[in-house]
Each structure stands twice: as structure tokens, then as C-alpha cells.
Amino acid sequence: MAKSATIVTLFFAALVFFAALEAPMVVEAQKLCERPSGTWSGVCGNSNACKNQCINLEKARHGSCNYVFPAHKCICYFPC
């Protein structure tokens, strides 16, 4: 009985050891820089339309309506 408990303990210790050695894969997020849309005119009230325009016309990664004094503007997000 003691021998089987020792084997189980050693097996568990080896499992923990190998799990500790396994390095998790970390994917670094790409930093995005923002700038006002060059193709949007007027006040931005529809973030989905802004996003589509930024992606399709300006080749940005993302777009959204953000408040930039004095009104909401379409802001596009590009890789820095």
C-alpha cells in the first residue's frame, strides 16, 4: 500500500513539474493609434457606419464615434 502511494505521489509531482515548465503562449496585442477620419463629414452619430467607413475607405483596423470637443467625431484606429 505504501509503495503505490509513493508511486502516485511521484507521478503527481512529475505532472506538476512538467506543467510548471510549460510556458503559456502570450500573444502581444498590436498597439493601435487613433486619428480623425479623413473621409467622414459632419457629426458622428452612428459608430457602425463610422467603423465600416474607416475599415473600407481608409484601411483602418477599427473605427468609432468619439466625443472630441465640441462634437462627436468619427475616429479611425490604425496600427502604430
UniProtKB/Swiss-Prot annotation:
Expression tissues: Expressed predominantly in siliques and dry seeds.
Domain of life: Eukaryota
Gene Ontology BP annotations: defense response; defense response to fungus; killing of cells of another organism
Record carries keyword Secreted: yes
InterPro entries xrefs: Defensin_plant, Scorpion_toxin-like, Scorpion_toxin-like_sf
UniProt keyword list: Antimicrobial, Disulfide bond, Fungicide, Plant defense, Pyrrolidone carboxylic acid, Secreted, Signal
UniProt-listed Pfam families: Gamma-thionin
Compartments it resides in: Secreted
Designated name of the protein: Defensin-like protein 13
Species of origin: Arabidopsis thaliana
Lineage: Eukaryota, Viridiplantae, Streptophyta, Embryophyta, Tracheophyta
